[in-house]
Amino acid sequence: MALQDVGSFFGMLTITVVATRFGRRPAFFGAFALCLIVTVFVFNSLRSGRDAYWMLPLMGFAQLSVFGGYSIYFPEIFPTRLRGTGVGFCYNTVRYLAAAFPPMLMYLNTMLVNQGVEEPFRKAATYLSFVFALGLVALIWAPETKGKPLPED
């Protein structure tokens, strides 16, 4: 866990710089694409405890960087009177949705085991990694907020 935290620290710093310089949508595009690539790579390449020392910080950098971007973006899309509620809603709704993924992972793993697939957990985790592609699709409807005033009532 600490290894991922080291990576996440640098990932969050990086996305804030990218979001400030190039815009929120390009920063999230890069972050979600990196999440997908790195997560699939790690699940399919991690072979030893030694690999974890460099792969887990990489995974933390990619997967947790988006939270630095959320801290910039979410307050910029809600008017003042709804800002706290809106930000809280965005952060916490996803937690409820994410709760479905561990049982889904185990279900996929069991299905793949029953089909005789080699390394079923890696395959199941790889399939679920494509959830990051949903983030890329969601960017189609995400407004760019860089350089715009905060919304007011």
Predicted segments — roles?
Residues 1-153:
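Transmembrane-helix signature of 12-pass secondary carriers
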